[in-house]
Swiss-Prot record:
It is an enzyme of class 2 (transferase). Keywords: DNA-directed RNA polymerase, Magnesium, Metal-binding, Nucleotidyltransferase, Transcription, Transferase, Zinc. This is DNA-directed RNA polymerase subunit beta'. The RNAP catalytic core consists of 2 alpha, 1 beta, 1 beta' and 1 omega subunit. When a sigma factor is associated with the core the holoenzyme is formed, which can initiate transcription.
Length: 1054
């Protein structure tokens, strides 16, 4: 209880009560003159302007006292809302006296707003809409929208002008005393002070009956002060504080990433969290992380206290707290028990997809760095060069259960974007397993036959055989669960020492892996078996060695194991694969030295030849046989070919036991272009403006670069750095917008019973397959049954899920088009149904009702965005080739902007009758004779044609190379064609960069892009012509009208 509660001090007016009222009690300023609210006057479109049907410029003149406005015409020739200058006003006043009324400032606007008869306006606008076209119609639709909103909500238009300004509670605009008696205060206090000062001055002036011009000036200043308070900088120059810094107004407090919503309401800093550098924890299991004792102590403090009191190790909470601060031995014992079975969440910024936060069980470690399991680094995109991660402790039982059941790292083996394992071994683990499964011909002990694995181990430990030695083993000694045939069991199996050890880590009943092929994942080939007594050494002398298991194959093994055994067995296999990989890579002793980079003897020859070709091209240019841009293109092509030739020769020269080659071949680190730069030539570089320079860097890093070459390569290096920084921000922003659009797409029901489907074929780019049919149909439901064209056998029934086996059989039957259920043709409102979505990529099972597929889709498209190349790549300003690629192209598609390097679409089906060039205005004219009419299209001279004279062309096809505008496709063809185009284009960009994304994610996004309909004819519905609305609402309105027997509306998708 507070003494003197509720008593108000008579000196300073402060009430005695609890301090928290300083966060809830508000004040207000009663204004001496009304002021307009800048949001309603300055917003786009201006709400005041729409209600009054006046231009924002006229309103500004009235509100800021530049012009008078007639508020009541009376019996004079003046009309309401007519603007008058100071001089005109004086002259008219002299002529008509008080027969008319005019005013200026927010007061006049308030009067005008109060005069608006909303009901009447609605009737008039609806009538106008029936006749109006073009801009007039657009304006009418906007006005009707806002006026109907006023009618529905019961708000009055004159309330857009304020007579009273509220003041937010004092604790939300704090003032703190600094040392030295100065004060630091929130900007809002400054802004409020300006309003109060001007308001008080205005009151005094009005009491004194000051001259009109002074009062007007004061009212304008009050209006400006109120504007600055609500949204500083929206109109005119912002009000600045000390050091010319614009003050943060109420709007700034809410707006953007640092505003109230995104900073404090959607994402808060939380207790029981920490952050530290991460380090690798090779000793951890798949679901564990190493937690430094010091951090554990703080994070689990309340749990430890409770346990200490419970075990009578501390008398009360305060004693327990002291014990923890002293780091007593009791505390350490309790800590071990407390963290058992208590999962924690680890997060690494930027969190681009849902695998950026996963749950682990903590294991106490010494030191100050958190230890992360090496296999989850890929999901987090983490490395150990100083990255930091945040840790959070779920407190409630529900939170812990959720973390355990849904978020444990061991359960996230497949990536949601493409359904491929995301926890595949990398780097050391890959090279270890690669080294282990390598075979070498003629190693010590080749052709020895052993009775079982233990004998092989003994022989290996005693150096009778090498890891790479090819040997034989009695098949009957291998585990009984292995799927060998009876015939194979009775024979000797041919394999290598390392492969025997590798197969030890696989599940008991998994096929014995002897060669990295898809077939071997299901059964082992008979050619690896010999009858007892056959000459094994002679056999080995004739058979070539088998390739080792590379990174991709290890991934395939994991995917196959996951498919058969699901989560638990897969995470155990992953841990065994990791341990084996680390052990073997340590034993292999792989290094990189200068001697691994060998000189290429053919290089001088290739370079000399390229120089000769360049000289020829230059000569042709000097004689005027070719243009400068053709010369440039040819030079670039010559050097690119020279570089490719050198690369090819390099690969031929590499020995299979060259350490660098092994690293790259296994997929552990590095690729061919790194080699070309080390041992071949660096090649062409891009100048800062993105144009490729004609002078290549001929040297490689083994020889060393000259000063000029070094200088050239700095351009490329700088561009690389800036691109990466820009790309990360761009990609993150794109993900945010995608999520925003798609977050309400959820799996709502089992089946929408749609009778439409999507015909899918392989996605091609010219003759190159970008996405094969197999990947497009896998995990989807068939809309129509598919039959084998030869045998007539049913491969898949209507509404049946296409599994790996079915997809394989469809491809083997030579079928090129399959009709599947798709998100495009789904009838479910506000979401998608299970049948139209198909398999959940992250689990490999059918998607469940309630899954937030929209968010998953947005993350799956946004997350690889950082891997896409930035910028458009200019090969020397040749117009035909300036087609956007990479991230900007993806943004261009999703925002439906007019594409750069646009391709013209034909609106008629017919024959190309002529292509005429007009050198004068640098254009080409293409004429197409359709069945009913002839069309002529004008293209730039530089456009690369896809059609020639006499070609037949179909409506909706492109005439020249480039990107079509989806907005044109939707007008010429239909929604489905547009959605299909979007999927194809996005896939092209991602697949070119080697990023795989499942179609269904792009389908979900494309469906959201085409969700709106523009009402063309409202029929007898309540819809307004020209309005944009959601397709579901449009259908509902039509269904209601049809039930009442009225005419339905017609609309056009946009």
């Amino acid at each position: 209880r507070i003494r003197y509660k509720g008593i108000v001090c008579d000196r300073c007016g402060v009430e005695v009560t609890s301090a928290k009222v300083r966060r809830e009690r508000m004040g207000h300023i009663e204004l001496a003159a009304p002021v307009s609210h800048i949001w309603y006057f300055k917003g786009i479109p201006s709400r005041m302007g729409l209600v009054l049907d006046m231009s924002p410029r006229s309103l500004e003149e009235i509100i800021y006292f530049a012009s008078y406005v007639v508020t009541k015409g009376g019996d004079t020739p003046l009309t309401e809302k007519q603007l008058l200058s100071e001089r005109e006003y004086r002259e008219l006043k002299a002529e008509y006296g008080n027969a008319f009324e005019a005013g200026m400032g927010a007061e006049a606007v308030q009067t005008l707003l109060a005069n608006v008869d909303l009901e009447e306006e609605v009737t008039e606008l609806k009538a106008e809409l029936r006749e109006a076209t073009g801009q007039k119609r657009v304006r009418a639709v906007r006005r009707l929208d806002i006026i109907e909103a006023f009618v529905k909500s019961g708000n009055k238009p004159e309330w857009m002008v304020m007579d009273v300004i509220p003041i937010i509670p004092p604790d939300l605009r704090p003032m703190v005393q600094l040392e030295g008696g100065r004060f630091a205060t929130s900007d809002l206090n400054d802004l409020y002070r300006r309003v109060i000062n001007r308001n008080n001055r205005l009151k005094r002036l009005l009491e004194l009956n000051a001259p009109g011009i002074i009062v007007q000036n004061e009212k304008r200043m009050l209006q400006e002060a109120a504007d600055a308070l609500v949204d500083n900088g929206r109109r005119g120059r912002p009000v600045t504080g000390p050091g010319n810094r614009p003050l943060k107004s109420l709007s700034h407090m809410l707006k953007g990433k640092q505003g109230r919503f995104r900073q404090n309401l959607l994402g808060k800093r939380v207790d029981y969290s920490g952050r530290s550098v991460i380090d690798v924890g090779p000793f951890l299991k798949m679901n564990q992380m190493g937690l430094p004792r010091q951090m554990a102590m703080e994070l689990f403090r309340p749990f430890i206290m409770k346990e200490l009191v419970k075990r009578d190790l501390a008398g009360n909470i305060r004693a327990a707290k002291r014990k923890i601060d002293r780091r007593d031995d009791d505390v350490m014992d309790v800590l071990e028990d407390v963290i058992k079975e208590h999962p924690v969440l680890l997060n690494r910024a930027p969190t681009l997809h849902r695998l950026g936060i996963q749950a682990f069980e903590p294991v106490l470690v010494s030191g100050k760095a958190m230890r992360l399991h090496p296999l989850v680094t890929e999901a987090y995109n983490a490395d150990f060069d100083g990255d930091q991660m945040a840790i959070h402790v779920p407190l409630s039982d529900e939170a812990q259960a959720e973390a355990r059941l849904l978020m444990l790292a061991a359960g996230h083996i497949l990536a949601p974007k493409d359904g491929k394992p995301i926890v595949a071994p990398s780097q050391d683990m890959v090279i270890g397993n690669y080294y282990l499964t390598t075979e070498e011909a003629g190693r010590e002990g080749e052709g020895m036959i052993f009775k079982d694995v233990n004998e092989v181990r003994t022989a290996y430990q005693n150096k009778y055989v090498h890891l790479h030695t090819r040997i034989g083993i009695q098949t009957s000694s291998l585990p009984a669960a292995k799927p060998f045939t009876a015939e194979q069991r009775s024979r000797i199996m041919l394999t290598s020492v390392g492969k025997l050890f590798f197969n030890d880590i696989l599940p008991e009943d998994f096929p014995f892996l002897n060669e990295p092929t898809e077939a071997n994942l299901h059964e082992i080939d008979n050619r690896f078996f010999l009858e007892p007594g056959e000459d094994i050494k002679a056999h080995y002398a004739e058979t070539p060695i088998l390739p080792p298991f590379k990174k991709g194959y290890l991934s395939d093994i994991i995917a196959e194991v996951y498919k058969i055994y699901k989560v638990t067995e897969t995470s155990l296999l992953l841990d065994r694969m990791k341990d084996l990989g680390y052990d073997e890579s340590t034993k292999s002793g792989l290094t990189v030295g200068v001697s691994d980079v060998t000189d290429l003897k053919e290089k001088p020859e290739i370079i000399a030849d390229a120089h000769k070709q360049v000289a020829t091209v230059t000569k042709q240019f000097r004689r005027g046989l070719i243009t400068d841009s053709e010369r440039y293109e040819r030079v670039i092509a010559i050097w690119n070919k020279a570089k490719d030739d050198i690369t090819e020769k390099l690969i031929e020269h590499f020995e299979p036991d060259n350490n660098i080659f092994m690293m790259s071949d296994s997929g552990a680190r590095g690729n061919i272009s790194n080699f070309t730069q080390l041992a071949g030539m660096r090649g062409l570089m891009a100048a800062p403006n993105g144009r490729i320079m004609e002078l290549p860097i001929i040297a490689n890093f083994r020889e060393g670069l000259s000063v000029l070459e070094m200088f050239f390569s700095t351009h490329g290096a700088r561009k690389g750095m800036t691109d990466t920084a820009l790309k990360t921000a761009d990609s993150g922003y794109m993900t945010r917008r995608l999520v925003d659009v798609a977050q309400d797409v959820i799996i709502r029901e089992l089946d929408c019973h749609s009778d439409r489907g999507l015909d899918v074929t392989a996605i091609m780019n010219g003759n190159e397959v970008i996405e094969p049919l197999y990947e497009r149909i896998l995990g989807r439901y068939a809309q129509k049954s598919v039959f084998d064209p030869e045998t007539g056998e049913t491969l898949v029934n209507h509404n049946e899920m296409i599994t790996e086996d079915i997809a394989k059989r469809i491809i083997e039957a030579g079928i090129t088009t399959v009709t599947i259920r798709s998100a495009f043709t789904c009838n479910t409102e506000h979401g998608v149904c299970v049948r139209c979505y198909g398999r959940n990529m992250a689990t490999g099972d059918v998607v469940e009702v309630g899954e937030a597929v929209g968010t998953v889709a947005a993350q799956s498209i946004g997350e690889p965005g950082t891997q896409l190349t930035m910028r458009t790549f200019h090969t020397g300003g040749v117009a035909g080739n300036d087609i956007t690629q990479g991230l900007p192209r993806v943004q261009e598609i999703f925002e439906a902007r007019n594409p750069k390097g646009r391709a013209m679409i034909t609106e008629v089906t017919g024959e190309v009758t002529s292509i005429e060039e007009n050198p004068a205005d640098r254009t080409k004219e293409v004429t197409i004779q359709g069945e009913t009419d002839t069309r002529t299209y004008t293209l730039p001279m530089t456009a690369r044609m896809r059609v020639g004279e006499g070609d037949r062309i179909h409506r909706g096809e492109t005439l020249n190379e480039g990107s079509a505008d989806p907005k044109e496709i939707i007008q010429v063809r239909d929604t489905l064609a547009t959605e299909n185009y979007i999927v194809h284009e996005v896939q092209k960009v991602y697949r070119m960069q080697g990023v795989e994304i499942s179609d269904k994610h792009i389908e979900v996004m494309a469906r959201q892009m085409l969700r709106k309909v523009r009402v063309m004819d409202p029929g007898e519905t309540d819809l307004l012509p020209g309005t944009l609305m959601d397709i579901a609402q449009f259908r509902d309105a039509n269904e209601d009208t049809l039930l009442k027997g009225g005419l339905p509306a017609t609309g056009r998708p946009v």
